[in-house]
């Protein structure tokens, strides 16, 4: 649980109910960072709890415990989101919702991260599939990343409804090793996820 919950514990041989602190109160008290991944897929009731922590003073009130937690000076809160809080307008991120403007306004910094450079993505794929770290293998991985770049351009132009992520390129490289066939691995890793008309 994010805030905490009542839990049954043994004390002096007897069962007692005690509040067990959740991850958010614990993190607030300590010099640490907490990261909420896929933040825009969170439930509204959870979002409103986090919204209180995003205020300028960042206090969290535990009403049932009659306690106000002030954040540690080095506490930090981060979140990741594919939709930047705008909701899913493309149909690619089903299950996400638009984050209300009051919530978005409380995030003091928002950074947008686009795809990596060709060379950086190639290096990551090579680190995940080190078998390719030969002259021929590096050329193959570079060509795979070029194909991924082409799918991203086609997606932005509205020509494709599916995009190739770095995760997909890594899977393609690994599957090509398993099947010993780059084309067949491409079909299984990416092409079969595309709309039938787009496959042609």
Predicted stretch roles:
Residues 1-200:
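C-terminal regulatory/interaction module of P-loop NTP-utilizing enzymes
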């Amino acid at each position: 649980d994010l805030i905490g919950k009542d839990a049954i514990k043994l004390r002096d041989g007897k069962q007692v109910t005690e509040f067990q602190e959740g991850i958010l109160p614990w993190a607030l008290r300590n010099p640490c960072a907490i990261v909420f991944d896929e933040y825009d897929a969170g439930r509204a009731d959870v979002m409103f709890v986090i919204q209180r922590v995003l205020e300028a003073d960042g206090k969290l009130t535990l009403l049932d415990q009659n306690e106000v937690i002030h954040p540690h000076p080095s506490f930090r809160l981060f979140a990741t989101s594919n939709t930047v809080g705008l909701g899913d307008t493309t149909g690619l991120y089903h299950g996400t919702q638009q984050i209300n403007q009051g919530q978005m306004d409380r995030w003091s910094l928002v950074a947008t991260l686009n795809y990596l450079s060709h060379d950086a993505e190639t290096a990551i794929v090579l680190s995940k599939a080190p078998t390719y770290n030969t002259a021929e293998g590096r050329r193959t991985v570079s060509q795979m990343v070029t194909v991924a770049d082409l799918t991203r351009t086609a997606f932005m132009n509205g020509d494709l409804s599916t995009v190739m992520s770095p995760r997909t390129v890594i899977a393609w490289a690994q599957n090509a090793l398993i099947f010993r066939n780059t084309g067949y691995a491409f079909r299984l890793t990416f092409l079969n996820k595309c709309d039938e008309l787009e496959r042609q």
